[in-house]
Amino acid sequence: MGNVQTSVNTYNITGDGNSFTPTSDMTSTAAPAIDLKPGVLNPTGKLWRPVGTSVATIDSLAIVSDRFGQYSFVNEGMRETFSKALFDINMWQPLFQATKTGCGPIVLSSFTTTTSGYVGATAGDALDNPVTNGVFISTVQVMNLQRTIAARMRDVALWQQHLDTAMTMLTPDISAGSASCNWKSLLAFAKDILPLDNLCLTYPNEFYNVAIHRYPALKPGNPDTKLPDAQAHPLGEVAGAFNAATSEVGSLVGSSSTLSQAISTMAGKDLDLIEADTPLPVSVFTPSLAPRSYRPAFIKPEDAKWIAEFNNSSLIRKTLTYSGATYAVQLGPGPTRVIDMNAMIDSVLTLDVSGTILPYDTNPDLSTSVPAFVLIQTSVPIQQVTTAANITAITVVSAAGASAINLAINVRGQPRFNMLHLQATFERETITGIPYIYGLGTFLIPSPTSSSNFSNPTLMDGLLTVTPVLLRETTYKGEVVDAIVPATVMANQTSEEVASALANDAIVLVSNHLNKLANVVGDAIPVASKTDDSATSAIVSRLAVQHKLSQVGQTSPTPPDYPLLWRRAKRAASMFVSNPSLALQVGIPVLTQSGMLSALTSGVGTALRTGSLGKGVTDASEKLRARQSLTVAKQAFFDQIGSLWPGK
């Protein structure tokens, strides 16, 4: 059967010469980027005309209003947006005709009015903006256009779903080279595989005529030459070509997007201030309300000011009444780490003790005890507590609903907690005026015996998650600060201090800044590859100067080993991208030396601002080989279709 061609180029899906030849030169595309947000569509100004006189003045101008409502000016941006929307809808005209829905293509001029007048939001604005033969849209026309587009898009959405199902099954895009498959074999394959209710089987020619505008792999044939028709090209071929991956730099669009995002992040987040040696307002460092998790039993008080420790030579027990029963809370034996609530931030505290060992085989007291999170008030700092009399009050803020033995599961002979979370919301106002108050996860012991004399019942080895709800102030080294000197924070902490810092700590705020910088460097600069990059070269320059300075005054100065400097710089840059918080820690080679991060930030910023579309795209030959391997696999798939569904 030959193709039936008319002046509107209607093609038959089974026509002679139809072919399926995907190529990496162009990807499938035709869907327009339609931005119908208010910021794009308004305000554009109303139509004004003089009333009672032919002379336009502020006093004589009035908004034009008739039975169609007021008239808004259709500027170039609005016209382009509407045109793209209609372009997308009208592409489906073959199906609208076949299903007898719609009334022909939608034409924007049918919903607009061309006239002259003045355009503005006020009479004063309009007087300065005369328009001759401008395009306007009335209130009624806007509503009609909106309803028309919405009605058509309802049908298009369903058809698009069915077409997507059919075409993705055929895999019409490849990332390198070209491939081909017998078109009639593909038709037989699709007919067998597609669900019976897929509309592509009901309206094959109509869907085919839509698809050839969207998928470059589909090439309808000329009935005379039995070759692809020279007139048939996808409507989105410009975008398709620029979206396609090239052997040189991959996707130009993707490269451009990476570059643009990196530049915006560098500028918008003030990442160049990361090593400033002057005070910066805390507001420069955007705080994060992301939760952070800790195991308080293993945090030393010297590493985190919000951890305190009871470490009396003998244990202490204090009784309390909870839910009508009497229990004892025990501190010790040995060090017992608690939360200094006056150093804690407003937050939701969740102590997860799931899987924690329950040694009630050696301490039977625990089997009848209740896991709980309590607040302990003392008359002296907890480090100075020596007797139960020093404890003035104990409040249970969260407790399990059963005793420990009913919450346990045996794992390889060891009793452990089932999933159990002790959760409480903490607000600083609730402890105002209480100088010594501490949080502790522990057991409420109903009748302690000598078995507990040698077993510390603390549950602070559980995972404590602190989810901030309000960050009132910023702290550093336990002191409240209203400004941060980044240079003093850099390379000035142990890894334990970094890990145990609360969300309002300057360490965390600067760490968040470092993470953003590391993301920019990692996304836009080929740090992890063997390529010499701007991040590495920025560090090398500082290392070379440092080496020269170290040789000043020596009788036989040693010249720098430049290949070694490049390797050290590459390791430092890679280390920063993979774990940026290392820059906060003491003793990390190269990365924590003064000026290194400043050099890296400056070098990367310069490289990005002067970069090209290819920035951030490296190892192109390796990527090309990988893409070619995918094409080989797809061609093998197409060959199997041709063999299993021979075209007739």
Swiss-Prot record:
Interacts with VP7 to form the outer icosahedral capsid with an incomplete T=13 symmetry, about 80 nm in diameter, and consisting of 200 VP4-VP7 trimers. Myristoylated N-terminal peptide may be released in the endosome and involved in permeabilization and delivery of transcriptionally active viral particles into the host cell cytoplasm (Potential). This is Outer capsid protein VP4. A lipid is attached at residue 2 (N-myristoyl glycine). It comes from the Viruses. Glycans are attached at residues 12, 311-312, 390, 453, 492. Belongs to the aquareoviridae outer capsid VP4 protein family. The record marks 42-43 as: Cleavage. Cleaved during the endosomal proteolytic disassembly of the outer capsid. N-terminally myristoylated. This acylation is essential for the membrane fusion activity. InterPro entries: Mu1/VP4, Mu1/VP4_sf, Mu1_membr_pen_domII, Mu1_membr_pen_domIII, Mu1_membr_pen_domIV. Coiled coil: none annotated. One of its GO terms (cellular component) is T=13 icosahedral viral capsid. It comes from Aquareovirus C (isolate Golden shiner/USA/GSRV/1977). The gene is S6. Its main location: virion. GO terms for biological process: symbiont entry into host cell via permeabilization of host membrane. GO terms for molecular function: host cell surface binding. It is found in: Virion. Keywords: Capsid protein, Glycoprotein, Lipoprotein, Myristate, Outer capsid protein, T=13 icosahedral capsid protein, Viral penetration into host cytoplasm, Viral penetration via permeabilization of host membrane, Virion, Virus entry into host cell. Interacts with VP6 and VP7.
